Amino acid sequence: MNKLFIDDLVERFGFELDTVLDGSQDGVKSKLIELDECEHFPMVCYEHTNDSSFDVDISESNFLNGTAHFGTWIMGLNEDEIIFVLNLKNKGNSTLEIDALEIRDELRGQGLGANIVAVIESVAEQYYNEIVVSPFDTDAQVFWEKMGYEWRNDYSLTKKLND
């Protein structure tokens, strides 16, 4: 992961939040458990979405345990409340993948996700040519389409930067 990009991104998020932590899957999992916040992040903790019937234990969640979701994890907090969890990956030299983005359940629909994505895009313009996402359910697909992302294939959407 591009360290300069991550440092810039964390600095930008820091203007909006009390604390921004970046690190590993283990660090995110530990903080979610420590603050007893797992119930507010069902996709990341339990692999559960509105379109799925999955409900695994946090120790089995591929997001927090599997190698497919290695990358840089970022967590935004206000006081002791986690606001969002984000996983970013490099996909080659010019593509950023937003591997996972989950907003605290009761804060969804208030524009927070759009603001987070806008910050990611504005910082990413300096380092990447495009952003790729692979939404996990239809709500996420609709969100990314509203954010201007276009279907690249059957499972991922992309947005060109610097056009």
Regions found by a protein language model. Name each.
Residues 62-74, 97:
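A short helix-loop-beta-strand connector motif used in the catalytic cores of GNAT acetyltransferases and
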Residues 94-105:
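Conserved acetyl-CoA binding element of GNAT-fold acetyltransferases
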Residues 103, 109-122:
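Conserved acetyl-CoA-binding loop-helix of GNAT-fold acetyltransferases
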Residues 124-136:
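Conserved GNAT acetyl-CoA-binding A-motif
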Residues 134, 145, 150-163:
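Conserved catalytic-core motifs of GNAT/GCN5-like acyltransferases
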